[in-house]
Structures are given as structure tokens and as C-alpha cells.
Amino acid sequence: MAENFWKRNGLDQASKEEDILYCIVKEMDSIADNDYLKDRERLGDFYKANQEQLMELSAAYGELIIREIGGKWAEDEDWRMKHRISFLEEVPAIGRVALPVNLIQYWENGGSRRLLWEYQEYKWAFGEWKRLCRLAGIETQADTAGKL
């Protein structure tokens, strides 16, 4: 699902975190229109017009979370392309991340600023979780996978 996003931006899953975030933010902001928030009917039309791009952004964002924090998709890609209720599961320190629902809510309520805030919250929670596990002497998958 994220393949179009990667191609469109000259990226791949191994690209730098900041490059991926920059392109997600740039695309999200390019389809944002503050006027649509005042009119729910228009919001629905605007969503339908941009649904495919939002799903691609969601897939790229999910892949970034999996790479940087951990977790896995709950459903296969074919299923995810047709449903808004997909999610990441087993994300360390977080549990579930509802994508693309979360990304669509970020787009509706603050756009890229909201997405970046939530992403830094995930990163902080993951870092704090690793620190506390170390203090407690608990080895995590992040330790054994070299993510420290």
C-alpha cells in the first residue's frame, strides 16, 4: 500500500526517519484545507477525494512505526487497502495503534502538527519503557534486536 508513497517521494522503507516524516507531513499538509472543517458534508467529500493518498500515508507511517519502535500489522496488505479499521499490534510500550483511523483524525484535527506530536509521544513512551525495563532487569525484544 505504501509503495506509491515510496515511489512518489523517491524513498524506501530504509530511508532516514526524518526524510520519511518530512514527506508524510508535506503530503498531509498539501491536501489539508481548513475550510472543510466548518462543513461536515464537505469534509466527507474531501475525504473521498483524498482517501487513497491518506491510506498510502497511513501505510508509510505504520511502516515507520514498525521500523523505529516495533510491532506488526494486524491484517495483510490486501485487507488493509480496503478498510479504515486496520491497526498495528504488539507495539512495545503502546500496544495497538489504529491506522489509518488515527492518521485520518490527525488530518481532520490539526494535520501534520498532530501527527508529529503523536509520533514523538510514541517514541518517548518506547524510550521510557526500555529504560524502565533495563532498571528492572527485564530483557526486551528491543534489546535483543539491537534497537537500543
What are the language-model segments listed below?
Residues 35, 46, 60, 118-121:
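Intrinsically disordered, low-complexity N-terminal regions enriched in serine/proline/glycine
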Residues 85-148:
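A recognition module on extended beta-rich or small alphabeta surfaces enriched in W/G with H and D/E
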Residues 1-53:
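N-terminal low-complexity, intrinsically disordered segments
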Residues 9, 68-69, 136:
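Residues at alpha-helix termini
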Residues 4, 22-26, 30-34, 67, ...:
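Charged/polar, solvent-exposed surface patches and flexible loops
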Residues 28, 38-39, 53, 65, ...:
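Alpha-helical protein-protein interaction elements
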Residues 48-109:
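Amphipathic protein-protein interaction modules
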